[in-house]
Structures are given as C-alpha cells and as structure tokens.
C-alpha cells in the first residue's frame, strides 16, 4: 500500500506482521516519507496496471518470495493487484482492496468525467519521474482479463467524500460515482464490501485498525481454504504467505 509521506512507518505493517509475514515495496515513481522519490528503478511514465503487475511479478521472483500471496493494495494499486491475480491465479490466495480504483468508474462517471479522470491520471508530475497512471489503457485490458473469483476478498470503501476531479464541480456526484464503482467491483469479485470506514481515501492512514482486521480476516480465510485442500489431498496444512502492496 502507498502510505502518506507524513507517516514514517505504515502503522499496520508491524501489527499484521504479528500473524503473517509482510512484504512491502515502493512502486517506481512513488514518494518516500519526506516527499522525495523512492529508490526504485525509474520507469517510463505514465504506467499501466499491466506494467505494474509485471514489475511486481519480477520483484517477487527476484526476491525469491514464494506464494501464494494475499495482496493488499490501495487506490491505483487495486488495479495492479487484480491484474496480477488475473494473470497468476495460482499465486494469489486473497485480496484486500483499500478504496481501490477500478475500471467500473468508466460506467459510473459521465463520459466527460471519465475522460477528465483519465487525463488527470496521465498528467506529468513533479518532480520528474513521479508516478502517473494510464487508466485509459489499463481499464479495457483489465475488463478483457480472466475474472478473479473464488478467493477470499474484502473491498474497503471511503465514506467521507474526497475530491476526485479537482476544480470540475459536482464533487458529491463524483463521490457517489466512486462508491457505485466500488459496489460493482465488490459484486464482480464476490467480495465482502465494508462501507462504514469513517475515512476518506487514505483508509490505511485514517483507520489502520480496520485495514489490519480485514487483512487478518482474509489471511485466516485463505488459510482455512488452503488447509482444507491440503488435508484432502495430502493430509498436511500449508499456510500461505502474504504480500502487502505499497
């Protein structure tokens, strides 16, 4: 998960680490705690969810981290996590999506709002090299990808309105579109949908205990599912690893 730079350590990492191993990484172009760019290798911007999934796959292979993983992702990272799960279904045992963006925004925003949202995501950022995202290419690719179903999943949705498209007006309708898109996403994944979060977009910073509880719930469900399968086939229970996406 990407953590606002004002926090030096994501508060949920050490807590989650008490019940499962946590692996976190800095996506190329994300910022450190002081607002400077992370030390990750720079990539061409804007980037797509498909490129993000490929980077994550290469990272896990390079770090020799064996799955299956429970992927935890925030905002744009939600598209990356779902793309990864679609491309590597045997490697993913659960999803925790924290106020995720999704392709369903194209259905709930007006065409003009969607175009503005896509252009906003692709805008060059300062300093040079900071992450810009290509929803216009990522959304149709994710729609065409095999659906991710049959694994424990939780979607956490902000219940405090935030400015999705600054300086365009209609903030309340935009917030409604964001929530409707998350309704569609949760239904698409057959996921538990938690909408009473007492948070804006950065749920992981504003309500970390809820994120921790959701991760625990998905990890335990993934373990039960894995144990049932192992007991049936081999009589041994395997506990999945967890990967937390920053």
What annotation goes with each model-predicted range?
Residues 1-35, 215:
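Conserved HGGG/HGGXW glycine-rich cap/lid loop of the alpha/beta-hydrolase fold
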Residues 66-104:
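Conserved hydrolase catalytic core segment
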Residues 191-246:
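Catalytic active-site module of serine/aspartate enzymes centered on a nucleophile-bearing elbow/loop
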Residues 24-70:
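Active-site loop/oxyanion-hole signature of alpha/beta-hydrolase fold enzymes
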Residues 124-145, 176-184:
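Active-site nucleophile elbow and catalytic-triad environment of alpha/beta-hydrolase enzymes
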Residues 155-157:
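Short beta-strand/loop motif that positions the catalytic acidic residue
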Residues 166-197, 218-219:
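Conserved loop-alpha-helix segment in the C-terminal half of the alpha/beta-hydrolase fold
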Residues 96-135, 165, 231:
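Flexible "cap/lid" loop of the alpha/beta hydrolase fold
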């Amino acid at each position: 998960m990407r953590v606002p730079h004002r926090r030096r350590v994501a508060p949920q990492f050490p807590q989650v680490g008490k019940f499962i191993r946590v692996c976190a990484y800095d996506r190329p172009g994300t910022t450190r705690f002081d607002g400077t760019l992370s030390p990750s290798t720079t990539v061409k911007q804007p980037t797509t969810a498909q490129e993000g999934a490929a980077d994550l796959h290469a990272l896990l292979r390079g770090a020799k981290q064996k799955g299956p993983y429970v992927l935890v992702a925030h905002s744009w990272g939600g598209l990356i996590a779902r793309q990864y799960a679609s491309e590597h279904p045997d490697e993913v045992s659960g999803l925790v999506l924290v106020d995720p963006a999704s392709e369903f925004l194209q259905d709930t925003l007006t065409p003009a709002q969607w175009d503005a949202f896509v252009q906003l995501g692709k805008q060059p950022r300062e300093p040079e090299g900071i992450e810009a995202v290509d929803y216009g290419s990522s959304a149709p690719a994710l729609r065409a990808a095999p659906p991710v179903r049959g694994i424990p999943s939780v979607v956490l949705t902000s219940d405090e309105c935030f400015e999705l498209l600054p300086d365009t007006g209609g903030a309340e309708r935009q917030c409604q579109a964001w929530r409707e898109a998350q309704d569609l996403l949760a239904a698409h994944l057959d996921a538990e949908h938690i909408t009473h979060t007492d948070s804006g977009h950065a749920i992981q910073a504003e309500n970390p205990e809820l994120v921790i509880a959701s991760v625990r719930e998905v990890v335990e469900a993934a373990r039960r599912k894995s144990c049932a399968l192992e007991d049936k086939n081999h009589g041994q229970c395997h506990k999945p690893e967890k990967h937390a996406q920053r």
